[in-house]
Protein backbone atom coordinates (compact mmCIF):
# COMPACT_ATOMS: atom_id res chain seq x y z
CA UNK A 1 0.00 0.00 0.00
CA UNK A 2 1.05 3.58 -0.62
CA UNK A 3 0.14 6.62 1.46
CA UNK A 4 0.30 10.00 -0.28
CA UNK A 5 0.78 13.11 1.82
CA UNK A 6 -1.15 16.31 1.21
CA UNK A 7 0.79 19.06 -0.53
CA UNK A 8 3.27 20.75 1.81
CA UNK A 9 2.86 18.13 4.54
CA UNK A 10 6.12 16.35 3.74
CA UNK A 11 8.30 18.90 5.55
CA UNK A 12 8.49 17.02 8.85
CA UNK A 13 9.43 13.80 7.05
CA UNK A 14 12.14 15.60 5.12
CA UNK A 15 13.47 16.59 8.55
CA UNK A 16 13.26 12.86 9.42
CA UNK A 17 10.56 13.13 12.07
CA UNK A 18 9.16 9.58 12.45
CA UNK A 19 5.42 10.33 12.75
CA UNK A 20 2.73 10.99 10.15
CA UNK A 21 -0.54 12.38 11.49
CA UNK A 22 -3.92 11.60 9.97
CA UNK A 23 -4.42 15.25 8.96
CA UNK A 24 -1.39 15.07 6.65
CA UNK A 25 -2.85 12.30 4.47
CA UNK A 26 -4.02 13.12 0.95
CA UNK A 27 -5.03 9.60 -0.08
CA UNK A 28 -4.29 5.90 0.30
CA UNK A 29 -3.68 3.48 -2.56
CA UNK A 30 -4.18 -0.22 -2.01
CA UNK A 31 -5.26 -2.13 1.08
CA UNK A 32 -3.32 -2.56 4.30
CA UNK A 33 -4.37 -3.80 7.70
CA UNK A 34 -3.23 -2.34 11.01
CA UNK A 35 0.52 -2.65 11.55
CA UNK A 36 1.47 -3.53 7.98
CA UNK A 37 4.40 -1.80 6.33
CA UNK A 38 3.48 0.87 3.78
CA UNK A 39 5.36 3.34 1.59
CA UNK A 40 4.99 7.07 2.23
CA UNK A 41 5.08 9.41 -0.78
CA UNK A 42 4.69 13.16 -1.19
CA UNK A 43 1.81 14.64 -3.18
CA UNK A 44 3.87 14.33 -6.39
CA UNK A 45 4.60 10.63 -5.83
CA UNK A 46 8.19 10.98 -4.59
CA UNK A 47 9.14 8.21 -2.15
CA UNK A 48 9.91 9.49 1.36
CA UNK A 49 9.85 6.65 3.88
CA UNK A 50 8.67 3.17 4.82
CA UNK A 51 6.34 3.08 7.82
CA UNK A 52 3.94 1.03 9.92
CA UNK A 53 0.25 1.74 9.31
CA UNK A 54 -1.96 2.59 12.31
CA UNK A 55 -5.46 3.32 10.96
CA UNK A 56 -7.05 3.67 14.42
CA UNK A 57 -4.52 6.19 15.72
CA UNK A 58 -4.11 9.93 15.19
CA UNK A 59 -0.53 8.97 14.31
CA UNK A 60 -1.53 7.13 11.15
CA UNK A 61 2.00 5.91 10.34
CA UNK A 62 5.30 5.52 12.19
CA UNK A 63 8.49 5.46 10.15
CA UNK A 64 10.71 2.37 10.21
CA UNK A 65 13.25 3.63 7.67
CA UNK A 66 14.10 6.54 5.39
CA UNK A 67 16.17 4.22 3.14
CA UNK A 68 14.20 3.00 0.14
CA UNK A 69 16.18 -0.23 -0.22
CA UNK A 70 15.76 -1.28 3.44
CA UNK A 71 13.39 -4.21 4.02
CA UNK A 72 11.54 -4.48 7.36
CA UNK A 73 12.32 -8.03 8.43
CA UNK A 74 14.15 -9.87 11.20
CA UNK A 75 17.54 -8.73 9.89
CA UNK A 76 16.36 -5.12 10.06
CA UNK A 77 15.66 -5.59 13.78
CA UNK A 78 19.04 -7.31 14.27
CA UNK A 79 20.77 -4.24 12.82
CA UNK A 80 18.82 -1.86 15.05
CA UNK A 81 19.54 -3.99 18.14
CA UNK A 82 23.26 -4.10 17.37
CA UNK A 83 23.38 -0.31 16.93
CA UNK A 84 21.63 0.21 20.25
CA UNK A 85 23.68 -2.37 22.12
CA UNK A 86 27.03 -0.78 21.31
CA UNK A 87 26.05 2.36 23.24
CA UNK A 88 24.56 0.40 26.17
CA UNK A 89 27.72 -1.71 26.45
CA UNK A 90 29.76 1.44 27.04
CA UNK A 91 27.25 2.79 29.58
CA UNK A 92 27.03 -0.52 31.42
CA UNK A 93 30.80 -0.59 31.75
CA UNK A 94 30.97 3.04 32.92
CA UNK A 95 28.16 2.88 35.49
CA UNK A 96 28.37 -0.75 36.62
CA UNK A 97 25.00 -1.75 35.16
CA UNK A 98 23.28 -5.05 34.55
CA UNK A 99 19.93 -3.35 34.00
CA UNK A 100 19.33 -0.72 31.30
CA UNK A 101 17.01 0.38 28.52
CA UNK A 102 18.12 -1.43 25.40
CA UNK A 103 15.59 0.09 22.98
CA UNK A 104 14.06 3.52 23.53
CA UNK A 105 11.44 3.54 20.78
CA UNK A 106 11.77 6.19 18.10
CA UNK A 107 15.14 7.37 19.41
CA UNK A 108 16.63 3.96 18.60
CA UNK A 109 14.87 3.76 15.24
CA UNK A 110 12.15 1.38 16.45
CA UNK A 111 8.94 3.38 16.97
CA UNK A 112 6.48 1.93 19.46
CA UNK A 113 9.02 -0.53 20.89
CA UNK A 114 10.51 -0.40 24.38
CA UNK A 115 12.93 -3.08 25.57
CA UNK A 116 14.53 -3.10 29.01
CA UNK A 117 17.21 -5.57 30.03
CA UNK A 118 17.41 -6.79 33.62
CA UNK A 119 20.28 -9.28 33.96
CA UNK A 120 19.32 -12.00 31.45
CA UNK A 121 15.68 -10.98 31.08
CA UNK A 122 14.51 -8.82 28.19
CA UNK A 123 11.20 -7.09 28.92
CA UNK A 124 9.19 -5.88 25.92
CA UNK A 125 6.53 -3.23 25.57
CA UNK A 126 4.96 -3.09 22.11
CA UNK A 127 2.97 0.14 22.05
CA UNK A 128 1.79 0.49 18.44
CA UNK A 129 0.07 -1.54 15.74
CA UNK A 130 3.32 -1.67 13.76
CA UNK A 131 5.29 -2.95 16.73
CA UNK A 132 2.68 -5.64 17.38
CA UNK A 133 2.60 -6.64 13.70
CA UNK A 134 6.38 -7.13 13.77
CA UNK A 135 6.35 -9.11 17.04
CA UNK A 136 7.54 -12.38 15.46
CA UNK A 137 10.38 -10.71 13.52
CA UNK A 138 11.47 -8.78 16.62
CA UNK A 139 11.43 -11.85 18.86
CA UNK A 140 13.43 -13.78 16.24
CA UNK A 141 16.02 -10.98 16.19
CA UNK A 142 16.20 -10.94 20.00
CA UNK A 143 16.73 -14.71 20.08
CA UNK A 144 19.52 -14.34 17.52
CA UNK A 145 21.25 -11.46 19.34
CA UNK A 146 20.60 -12.62 22.93
CA UNK A 147 20.43 -16.43 23.00
CA UNK A 148 21.24 -16.37 26.72
CA UNK A 149 18.19 -14.21 27.57
CA UNK A 150 14.57 -14.97 28.41
CA UNK A 151 11.96 -12.65 26.90
CA UNK A 152 8.96 -11.36 28.87
CA UNK A 153 6.09 -9.25 27.51
CA UNK A 154 4.74 -6.28 29.51
CA UNK A 155 2.52 -4.84 26.79
CA UNK A 156 -0.18 -4.33 29.43
CA UNK A 157 -0.37 -0.57 28.93
CA UNK A 158 -3.51 1.42 28.10
CA UNK A 159 -1.89 3.28 25.17
CA UNK A 160 -2.33 0.07 23.14
CA UNK A 161 -6.09 0.63 23.19
CA UNK A 162 -5.61 3.78 21.09
CA UNK A 163 -4.14 1.48 18.42
CA UNK A 164 -7.01 -1.02 18.66
CA UNK A 165 -4.78 -3.55 20.44
CA UNK A 166 -5.49 -5.78 23.42
CA UNK A 167 -3.26 -5.68 26.49
CA UNK A 168 -0.83 -8.61 26.70
CA UNK A 169 1.56 -9.94 29.32
CA UNK A 170 3.54 -13.13 29.86
CA UNK A 171 6.60 -15.16 28.97
CA UNK A 172 7.46 -15.04 25.27
CA UNK A 173 10.61 -17.15 25.38
CA UNK A 174 12.61 -18.92 28.06
CA UNK A 175 12.03 -18.73 31.79
CA UNK A 176 9.45 -16.92 33.88
CA UNK A 177 11.14 -14.04 35.75
CA UNK A 178 11.50 -14.46 39.52
CA UNK A 179 9.25 -12.45 41.85
CA UNK A 180 12.14 -10.05 42.49
CA UNK A 181 15.32 -9.79 40.42
CA UNK A 182 18.32 -7.78 41.70
CA UNK A 183 20.12 -5.38 39.38
CA UNK A 184 23.06 -3.07 40.05
CA UNK A 185 23.80 0.60 39.28
CA UNK A 186 26.58 2.77 40.67
CA UNK A 187 27.32 0.16 43.33
CA UNK A 188 23.68 -0.10 44.49
CA UNK A 189 21.66 -3.31 44.37
CA UNK A 190 17.99 -2.80 43.52
CA UNK A 191 15.16 -5.32 43.26
CA UNK A 192 12.97 -5.38 40.14
CA UNK A 193 9.43 -6.77 40.00
CA UNK A 194 9.21 -7.57 36.29
CA UNK A 195 5.79 -9.21 36.44
CA UNK A 196 3.85 -6.73 38.57
CA UNK A 197 5.96 -3.57 38.85
CA UNK A 198 5.33 -0.20 37.23
CA UNK A 199 6.26 0.11 33.54
CA UNK A 200 8.61 -2.83 32.81
CA UNK A 201 9.30 -3.27 36.54
CA UNK A 202 11.63 -0.40 37.40
CA UNK A 203 12.36 3.28 36.68
CA UNK A 204 15.69 2.96 34.90
CA UNK A 205 15.37 6.52 33.60
CA UNK A 206 16.09 8.06 37.04
CA UNK A 207 19.55 6.49 37.42
CA UNK A 208 21.48 9.76 37.10
CA UNK A 209 19.07 11.54 39.44
CA UNK A 210 19.58 8.84 42.07
CA UNK A 211 23.33 9.38 41.88
CA UNK A 212 22.76 13.11 42.35
CA UNK A 213 20.53 12.43 45.38
CA UNK A 214 23.30 10.31 46.86
CA UNK A 215 25.77 13.17 46.43
CA UNK A 216 23.45 15.71 48.11
CA UNK A 217 22.35 13.46 51.00
CA UNK A 218 25.30 13.65 53.42
CA UNK A 219 24.05 14.52 56.92
CA UNK A 220 20.58 15.49 55.70
CA UNK A 221 17.13 14.46 56.90
CA UNK A 222 15.45 13.29 53.68
CA UNK A 223 11.80 12.91 52.67
CA UNK A 224 11.36 10.61 49.66
CA UNK A 225 7.90 11.23 48.13
CA UNK A 226 6.21 8.75 45.78
CA UNK A 227 9.02 6.41 46.73
CA UNK A 228 7.98 3.31 44.75
CA UNK A 229 10.51 0.58 45.71
CA UNK A 230 12.85 2.97 47.48
CA UNK A 231 15.73 3.39 45.05
CA UNK A 232 16.11 7.06 46.03
CA UNK A 233 16.09 6.00 49.70
CA UNK A 234 18.92 3.54 49.07
CA UNK A 235 20.83 6.30 47.26
CA UNK A 236 20.32 8.70 50.19
CA UNK A 237 21.46 6.10 52.72
CA UNK A 238 24.53 5.31 50.62
CA UNK A 239 25.19 9.06 50.64
CA UNK A 240 25.23 9.00 54.47
CA UNK A 241 21.93 10.78 55.12
CA UNK A 242 20.85 11.30 58.72
CA UNK A 243 17.40 9.78 58.07
CA UNK A 244 15.19 9.00 55.07
CA UNK A 245 11.40 8.70 55.16
CA UNK A 246 9.85 7.02 52.10
CA UNK A 247 6.18 7.62 51.32
CA UNK A 248 3.94 5.72 48.90
CA UNK A 249 0.30 4.62 48.76
CA UNK A 250 1.25 0.98 48.09
CA UNK A 251 2.34 -1.23 50.97
CA UNK A 252 3.73 -3.85 48.59
CA UNK A 253 6.26 -1.43 47.07
CA UNK A 254 7.22 -0.14 50.53
CA UNK A 255 7.92 -3.74 51.56
CA UNK A 256 10.29 -4.04 48.58
CA UNK A 257 11.85 -0.69 49.56
CA UNK A 258 12.68 -2.12 52.97
CA UNK A 259 14.17 -5.21 51.30
CA UNK A 260 16.31 -2.94 49.11
CA UNK A 261 17.77 -1.25 52.20
CA UNK A 262 18.53 -4.65 53.72
CA UNK A 263 19.97 -5.98 50.43
CA UNK A 264 22.54 -3.17 50.46
CA UNK A 265 23.37 -3.83 54.14
CA UNK A 266 22.45 -0.26 55.08
CA UNK A 267 21.30 0.99 58.49
CA UNK A 268 17.58 0.18 58.62
CA UNK A 269 17.16 2.31 61.75
CA UNK A 270 17.77 5.40 59.58
CA UNK A 271 14.95 4.43 57.18
CA UNK A 272 11.22 4.84 57.74
CA UNK A 273 8.45 3.68 55.39
CA UNK A 274 5.02 5.33 55.47
CA UNK A 275 1.94 4.28 53.52
CA UNK A 276 0.03 7.50 52.93
CA UNK A 277 -1.17 10.03 50.38
CA UNK A 278 1.74 12.40 49.74
CA UNK A 279 -0.41 15.54 49.39
CA UNK A 280 -2.14 14.87 52.71
CA UNK A 281 1.04 13.86 54.52
CA UNK A 282 2.82 17.05 53.43
CA UNK A 283 -0.06 19.13 54.80
CA UNK A 284 0.03 17.17 58.05
CA UNK A 285 3.80 17.67 58.33
CA UNK A 286 3.36 21.41 57.74
CA UNK A 287 0.75 21.61 60.51
CA UNK A 288 3.07 19.67 62.84
CA UNK A 289 6.06 21.92 62.09
CA UNK A 290 8.18 19.09 60.64
CA UNK A 291 11.33 20.15 58.77
CA UNK A 292 13.63 18.38 56.32
CA UNK A 293 17.00 19.07 54.69
CA UNK A 294 16.19 17.36 51.39
CA UNK A 295 12.94 16.37 49.70
CA UNK A 296 12.72 14.16 46.62
CA UNK A 297 9.53 14.80 44.65
CA UNK A 298 9.12 12.19 41.90
CA UNK A 299 5.37 11.91 41.28
CA UNK A 300 3.62 9.73 38.71
CA UNK A 301 2.62 11.26 35.39
CA UNK A 302 0.10 14.08 36.00
CA UNK A 303 -0.47 14.74 32.27
CA UNK A 304 -1.84 12.02 29.97
CA UNK A 305 -3.17 14.42 27.32
CA UNK A 306 -3.08 18.14 26.52
CA UNK A 307 -6.48 18.78 28.10
CA UNK A 308 -5.01 17.81 31.49
CA UNK A 309 -2.06 20.22 31.33
CA UNK A 310 -3.71 23.08 33.27
CA UNK A 311 -4.81 20.83 36.14
CA UNK A 312 -1.39 19.16 36.15
CA UNK A 313 0.28 22.56 36.52
CA UNK A 314 -1.86 23.23 39.59
CA UNK A 315 -0.97 19.82 41.03
CA UNK A 316 2.77 20.27 40.48
CA UNK A 317 2.66 23.79 41.94
CA UNK A 318 0.72 22.71 45.04
CA UNK A 319 2.90 19.74 45.87
CA UNK A 320 6.16 21.61 45.33
CA UNK A 321 4.93 24.59 47.36
CA UNK A 322 4.25 22.22 50.27
CA UNK A 323 7.70 20.66 49.87
CA UNK A 324 9.45 24.04 49.86
CA UNK A 325 7.60 25.02 53.04
CA UNK A 326 8.92 21.88 54.77
CA UNK A 327 12.57 22.53 53.87
CA UNK A 328 15.02 24.32 56.12
CA UNK A 329 17.13 27.18 54.70
CA UNK A 330 19.89 25.57 52.66
CA UNK A 331 17.68 22.54 52.04
CA UNK A 332 17.55 20.79 48.67
CA UNK A 333 14.45 19.98 46.62
CA UNK A 334 14.87 17.43 43.83
CA UNK A 335 11.67 17.78 41.80
CA UNK A 336 10.72 15.88 38.65
CA UNK A 337 8.06 15.60 35.96
CA UNK A 338 7.93 12.46 33.81
CA UNK A 339 5.31 13.77 31.38
CA UNK A 340 6.42 14.44 27.83
CA UNK A 341 3.60 16.98 27.51
CA UNK A 342 5.12 19.15 30.27
CA UNK A 343 7.74 21.45 28.68
CA UNK A 344 10.93 21.89 30.68
CA UNK A 345 10.66 25.68 30.76
CA UNK A 346 7.06 25.50 31.99
CA UNK A 347 8.03 23.05 34.73
CA UNK A 348 10.81 25.39 35.84
CA UNK A 349 8.31 28.28 35.96
CA UNK A 350 5.95 26.13 38.07
CA UNK A 351 8.75 25.55 40.58
CA UNK A 352 9.50 29.28 40.66
CA UNK A 353 5.81 30.05 41.26
CA UNK A 354 5.63 27.36 43.95
CA UNK A 355 8.55 29.00 45.76
CA UNK A 356 6.85 32.39 45.52
CA UNK A 357 3.65 30.98 47.02
CA UNK A 358 5.69 29.23 49.71
CA UNK A 359 7.28 32.55 50.66
CA UNK A 360 10.84 31.47 49.87
CA UNK A 361 13.49 32.25 47.31
CA UNK A 362 15.05 29.24 45.59
CA UNK A 363 18.13 28.79 43.45
CA UNK A 364 18.21 26.33 40.54
CA UNK A 365 21.51 24.52 41.05
CA UNK A 366 21.27 21.47 38.77
CA UNK A 367 19.07 20.18 35.96
CA UNK A 368 18.15 16.55 35.21
CA UNK A 369 16.82 14.49 32.33
CA UNK A 370 16.39 10.80 31.66
CA UNK A 371 19.53 8.67 31.85
CA UNK A 372 21.72 8.16 28.79
CA UNK A 373 20.27 4.73 27.96
CA UNK A 374 17.09 6.73 27.17
CA UNK A 375 18.62 8.86 24.37
CA UNK A 376 16.73 11.53 22.43
CA UNK A 377 17.33 11.48 18.69
CA UNK A 378 17.64 15.02 17.31
CA UNK A 379 14.81 14.55 14.82
CA UNK A 380 12.34 13.49 17.55
CA UNK A 381 12.52 16.01 20.44
CA UNK A 382 9.35 14.46 21.90
CA UNK A 383 11.63 11.68 23.11
CA UNK A 384 12.70 13.94 25.99
CA UNK A 385 10.00 13.31 28.60
CA UNK A 386 11.72 13.32 32.01
CA UNK A 387 12.89 16.61 33.41
CA UNK A 388 13.93 17.70 36.86
CA UNK A 389 15.67 20.36 38.89
CA UNK A 390 17.72 20.52 42.04
CA UNK A 391 16.62 23.62 43.92
CA UNK A 392 18.31 25.16 46.97
CA UNK A 393 16.12 26.93 49.51
CA UNK A 394 17.48 30.34 50.49
From Swiss-Prot:
Keywords: Cytoplasm, Methyltransferase, RNA-binding, rRNA processing, S-adenosyl-L-methionine, Transferase. GO terms for cellular component: cytoplasm. Gene3D superfamilies: PUA domain (2.30.130.10), RNA methyltransferase domain (HRMD) like (3.30.750.80), Vaccinia Virus protein VP39 (3.40.50.150). The keyword NADP does not apply. SUPFAM superfamilies: PUA domain-like, S-adenosyl-L-methionine-dependent methyltransferases. It is an enzyme of class 2 (transferase). Specifically methylates the cytosine at position 1962 (m5C1962) of 23S rRNA. GO terms for molecular function: RNA binding; rRNA (cytosine) methyltransferase activity. Its main location: cytoplasm. PROSITE patterns: PUA. It catalyses: cytidine(1962) in 23S rRNA + S-adenosyl-L-methionine = 5-methylcytidine(1962) in 23S rRNA + S-adenosyl-L-homocysteine + H(+). It is found in: Cytoplasm. Pfam families: Methyltrans_SAM, PUA_3. Belongs to the methyltransferase superfamily. RlmI family. This is Ribosomal RNA large subunit methyltransferase I. Its EC number is 2.1.1.191. It comes from Yersinia enterocolitica serotype O:8 / biotype 1B (strain NCTC 13174 / 8081). Residues 1-79 form the PUA domain.
Amino acid sequence: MRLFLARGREKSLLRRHPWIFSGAVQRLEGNASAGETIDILDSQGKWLARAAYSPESQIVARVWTFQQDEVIDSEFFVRRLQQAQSWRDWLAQRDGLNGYRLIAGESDGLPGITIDRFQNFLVLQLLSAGAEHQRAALVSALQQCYPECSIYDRSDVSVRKKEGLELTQGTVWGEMPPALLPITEHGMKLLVDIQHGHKTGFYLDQRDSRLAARNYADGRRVLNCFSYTGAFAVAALMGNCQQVISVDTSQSVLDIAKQNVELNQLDLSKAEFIRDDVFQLLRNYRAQGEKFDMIIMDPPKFVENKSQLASACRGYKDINMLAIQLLRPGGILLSFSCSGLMPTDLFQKILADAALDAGHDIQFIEQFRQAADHPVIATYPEGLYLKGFACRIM
